[in-house]
Amino acid sequence: EDIKDEKDKVRNKVVDVSSKMNTGAKYDSKVFKKTVGLNGVGIKAVNALSEYFHIQSIRDKQEKSIEFSQGQIVSENPISQSSNENGVIIKFKPDENMFGNYRYISEYIETLLRNYVFLNSGLRINFNGNKFFSRNGLLDLLDEKMNAPGKYPIIHLKGEDIEIAITHGNQYGEEYYSFVNGQHTTQGGTHLLAFKEAYVRTIRDFYNKNYE
């Protein structure tokens, strides 16, 4: 349905993305190739399974906030003008009838959020007062993971659909952090195998030698 009123459009978008199915990023072909998940189900599931869920969206100097309980709208504030930067604030409390004695594993969550900012340089995330930000993407990730200076400055390559950061250290063995569509692929995959093969082949071709 074509929404003519701009305020209704803003309001409906906030409601749709947080509570209605089939409104995820995968319905935009330009975003689909770089996103992970299933049709935006995640935020809807959190909303439906929370006794308190509050979403506040700030975009293009307009602000909209809505409060839900178990996926149903409880209250909402009218669209207002805002001087804040574009972004989204989400607060929620899981439904104790569903989860009982739940607890958050902060270390796990913070690792996920840290990866998100490395993969989306310039993105700022505030989680319970802890701020996560990366200006240089995977270069910052590799710099943080290294326990000692590398043998040479980190090589950082970034294209439209690929980003690579690589260096060598003094430790024995190899360590990789690979990602696809914003998801940390802890078990590797064909993307990692292809990179390793191309890397070794390039060195062989450059020096015109074969290495085992």
Task: Say what each PLM segment does.
Residues 22-23, 95, 169-173:
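Short connector loops/turns at beta-strand edges and beta->alpha or beta->beta junctions
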Residues 107, 114-116, 122-212:
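GHKL/Histidine-kinase-like ATPase module
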Residues 17:
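Short basic (Lys/Arg) and small-residue
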Residues 21-29, 203-210:
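Structural motif corresponding to the C-terminal cap of alpha-helices
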Residues 1-13, 24-144:
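GHKL-type ATPase core
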